[in-house]
Design a protein with these regions (language model features):
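Helix-loop boundary and gating motifs at the non-cytosolic
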Residues: 2-57
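Hydrophobic core of transmembrane alpha-helices in multi-pass small-molecule transporters
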Residues: 18, 92-123
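Transmembrane alpha-helix termini and helix-breaking/packing motifs in multi-pass membrane transporters
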Residues: 33, 37, 100, 155-173
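Central cavity-lining transmembrane alpha-helices of secondary-active solute carriers
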Residues: 49-74
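Glycine-rich segments within core transmembrane alpha-helices of 12-TM secondary carriers
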Residues: 60, 141-166
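Structural signature of the two symmetry-related core transmembrane helices
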Residues: 81-97
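Symmetry-related core transmembrane helices of the 12-TM Major Facilitator Superfamily/SLC fold
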Residues: 171-190
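Helix-loop junctions on the cytosolic side of multi-pass membrane transporters
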Residues: 188-201
Length: 206
């Protein structure tokens, strides 16, 4: 019997990628503006802004592999990947939401940016790994298409809504995204059930 992709579950899982794409699109659009203002009279301002904006890339090559590997070895009552999502996404939402509140102080904003990047690193790799964990091997290509669609929708939402909210108040895009991340965390906890044994992982079950 041919197995079919569970589209409702896959779209639900895609909310994690939706949140990631939304938050990073807003981050990359508006954080340089905040930095440009707070570093207005600083020598080598452009270089400093460029360096600060690489924090997520530094986290991507250092922290994300660590948390991804750690989630491979995790299993408890919350699942394998879900503990990292439940811990990281709300923290990421909190620190993301407060970034614009500290935009007049470089030290405070840097603290929020670093904390946000650390929190995002906790759940990003486990979120990516969750799709193949809950999807049969033959259906993973279809599921990946759904996931990428959800990520694209998150980026589009940032593009169409972010600037409008920013024009009302620079903090609104960040608060909006933070609230969505909290809601998405709750939805993922409610709707996604991880299997203890992963089908077809590396040619053998985990």
């Amino acid at each position: 019997m041919t197995r079919k992709l569970d589209y409702p579950r896959t779209f639900t899982l895609g909310l994690g990628f939706f949140a990631i794409s939304l938050s990073w699109a807003l981050y990359n659009a508006f954080v340089p503006v905040f930095l440009d203002n707070v570093l207005a009279d600083t020598v080598l301002k452009g270089t400093l802004i460029g360096f600060i904006m690489t924090f997520d890339n530094i986290a991507a090559v250092t922290l994300q592999p660590y948390f991804g590997a750690a989630s491979d070895r995790t299993w408890n009552r919350y699942g394998r990947r879900m503990p990292y999502i439940l811990a990281g996404m709300p923290l990421g939402a909190l620190f993301f939401a407060v970034i614009p509140l500290f935009r007049s102080s470089l030290a405070s904003m840097m603290t929020a940016l670093i904390a946000m990047n650390l929190a995002m690193a906790i759940f990003r790799a486990p979120t990516v790994a969750l799709m193949p964990d809950i999807t049969p091997p033959a259906l993973r290509s279809k599921a990946n298409g759904v996931i990428n669609l959800m990520g694209g929708l998150g980026a589009l939402l940032a593009f169409f809504v972010g600037s409008r909210l920013y024009n009302v108040n620079p903090a609104l895009p960040f608060v909006f995204a933070g609230l969505l991340m909290i809601i998405i965390t709750l939805v993922l906890k409610w709707r996604i059930r991880e299997p203890e044994v992963v089908e077809g992982a590396g040619g053998a079950d985990l």
